[in-house]
A protein has these predicted regions:
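RecA-like helicase/translocase P-loop NTPase motor core
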Residues: 1-207
């Protein structure tokens, strides 16, 4: 599924005639006790890319909430420009609602709480800095959790877990712009009913 998503995104990106720009995540290990495997696992758990490839004109989706900067997880937009000012880089994005923002890299911190007497101290173990966006032509159901998507085309060919269909369809904020897509060569109604998996514990609870 990830391969299919990546292929769609790269295919759409390749059709843009603007130059390709790559941003690599900047990782800093502040505590030498942290093992590389532990650090890698933490980075993979974040909703960002270690290597972000974009072009001006690309459709993107925001991957975190940043109330102060006026962008939210699941919002979409188009890259208008990439600006280099002294030692800073900004990505100019026009969101679907028409608002224009200058996006800066976002820093995630790996932290632990340490008790010091009666107080607790926050220790920073590591950090990773990256632009919190991804290409938005396609995304997996798992990665879409928590997002609100305005225009959604949902491919239901690979539904296999309880509640997965609900997670996928409930991302849509507007039923009028929701499209359900399947390439299965069987009756759609039969297939849809078959993948509408409900956990037995939920059924038992509502009896």
């Amino acid at each position: 599924i990830n391969k299919k998503v990546n292929n769609i995104n790269q295919e759409k990106l390749s059709k843009l005639e603007t130059p390709l720009v790559c941003f690599k995540a900047q990782v800093k290990k502040e505590d030498k006790r942290i093992k590389d495997e532990e650090l890698d696992s933490w980075i993979r758990s974040l909703n960002i890319l270690e290597e972000l490839n974009i072009k001006i004109g690309a459709r993107i989706i925001f991957c975190v909430n940043n109330w102060d900067k006026n962008y939210y997880n699941g919002e979409q937009g188009i890259i208008e420009d990439i600006l280099y000012e002294e030692e800073k880089i900004y990505i100019s994005i026009i969101k679907n609602n028409g608002m224009k923002i200058l996006l800066e890299p976002y820093t995630f911190f790996m932290e632990e709480l340490e008790q010091s007497g009666k107080d607790f101290v926050v220790n920073i173990l590591a950090s990773v800095t990256q632009f919190p966006i991804k290409l938005a032509y396609a995304i997996t159901i798992h990665k879409s959790q928590g997002m609100s998507i305005e225009k959604l085309v949902c491919d239901i060919d690979h539904i296999f877990e309880n509640g997965q269909l609900y997670v996928a369809l409930s991302r849509a904020t507007n039923p009028n712009t929701l499209k359900i897509y399947s390439t299965k060569k069987i009756n759609f109604g039969f297939y849809f009913a078959n993948i509408l998996k409900i956990d037995s514990n939920v059924i038992e609870f509502y009896k």
